From Swiss-Prot:
Native organism: Streptomyces coelicolor (strain ATCC BAA-471 / A3(2) / M145)
Gene Ontology MF term list: agmatine deiminase activity; protein-arginine deiminase activity
Location of the active site: 331
Coiled-coil intervals, chain numbering: none
Catalytic activity: agmatine + H2O = N-carbamoylputrescine + NH4(+)
E.C. code: 3.5.3.12
Pfam families found in the cross-reference section: PAD_porph
Biological processes, Gene Ontology terms: putrescine biosynthetic process
Name of the protein in question: Putative agmatine deiminase
Source organism superkingdom: Bacteria
Top EC class of this enzyme: hydrolase
């Protein structure tokens, strides 16, 4: 039986998320409260368009319900962190109404010294069980934020994730591609050399592609474009644009590359180079939930996404607190396709 990962814009059954609890990312009560408010804002925005299930840790149901309201489903499971894109399963379908869940190996984004993943490594199987989806186990260390597909055979990847020594030492590029293609039903991999500069900080993923580039439809990719030469991502984004403009997808189409200007802010509240990116958005049934940063370019980005998704409502949600923890809106959501 052949499975494939549908594109994010295909119809969803629901969205899965994970509720923030006390951990290495949210180290004090103020940070945790801010994270929970931010996650709740995203969940409520997505719930306008489709069902949402929030996985929460023991004893956290009351707080979750208070912030999420009555319309988000709650499920209790042990968690280490709250990035469902990475710890949850990658759902795939067989085109005949069958659903399955790819369970990648999760090791804390390359076995980082601060990360704990005893419970998160099991979440993909828990979610698959709740979705009544058989599990397709993979030996590849990988996360959902490290892949993006067009639904027609093409997948975006980055060298520093799948080929990184902390994840898959000893794997060749060809071996990684073979495993990705076998699980996602893809045939063509487009590799970028790395992620944004800020993604290599203490709580970074070491190069996830979903903050850099994403398919908006077959043949069209949105790309983070840092226009300010003072920012280290200026040179990086120029390289991404050059690579993607020179590539063709699985159908032989030369990619249409849509530049999405980065926010104008250059440094975050900690004084570090900001990796704020509008690329880390989430497409759901009838909607696009887009990161906002209190920045003049927020509405510019919203306009670009409205043109790309004219049939969907674009909703801006402040994502600065999420980015402070190491990710964005796409990182905390995981779609279950409708079958």
């Amino acid at each position: 039986m052949t499975f494939r990962m549908p594109p994010e814009w295909a119809p969803h059954e629901r969205t899965w998320m994970a509720w923030p609890g006390p951990n290495a990312t949210f180290t004090d009560a103020e940070e945790l409260a801010g994270a929970r408010a931010a996650w709740a804002s995203v969940a409520r925005a997505v719930r306008r368009f489709e069902p949402v299930t929030m996985v929460h840790g023991p004893g956290q149901a009351a707080t979750a319900r208070e912030l999420l309201g009555p319309d988000v489903d709650l499920v209790e499971r042990e968690l280490d962190d709250a990035w469902m894109r990475d710890i949850g399963p990658t759902f795939v379908t067989d085109g005949r109404g069958g659903l399955a869940a790819v369970d990648w190996v999760f090791n804390g984004w390359g076995a980082q010294d601060w990360a704990r993943w005893e419970h998160d490594a099991e979440i993909a199987r828990h979610v698959a069980d709740l979705a009544a989806a058989p599990v397709l186990s993979s030996p590849l260390v990988n996360e959902g934020g490290a892949i993006h597909v067009d639904g027609e055979g093409t997948v975006l990847l980055t060298d520093t994730v799948q080929l990184g020594s902390g994840r898959n030492p000893g794997w060749s590029r060809e071996e990684v591609e073979a495993e990705i293609h076998a699980k996602l039903g893809t045939t063509t991999a487009i590799w970028l050399p790395h992620g944004l500069a800020g993604d290599y900080g203490r709580y970074g993923t070491q190069g996830h592609v979903d903050i850099v580039a994403a398919f908006a439809r077959p043949g069209t990719v949105v790309v983070h474009s840092q226009r300010d030469p003072r920012h280290p991502d200026h040179e990086r984004s120029q390289l991404y644009l050059e690579i993607l403009r020179g590539r063709t997808d699985a159908r032989g189409r030369r990619l249409e590359v849509v530049e999405v200007p980065a926010p104008t802010v250059l440094k975050d509240e900690e004084g570090e180079w900001a990796d704020y990116s509008y690329i880390n958005h989430y497409v759901c049934n009838g909607g696009v939930v887009l990161c906002a940063f209190g920045d003049p370019n927020d509405e510019l980005a919203a306009g670009i996404f409205r043109r790309l998704f004219p049939e969907r409502t674009v909703t801006l949600v402040d994502a600065r607190t999420i980015f402070a923890g190491g990710g964005g809106i796409h990182c905390i959501t995981q779609q279950q396709p409708r079958t």
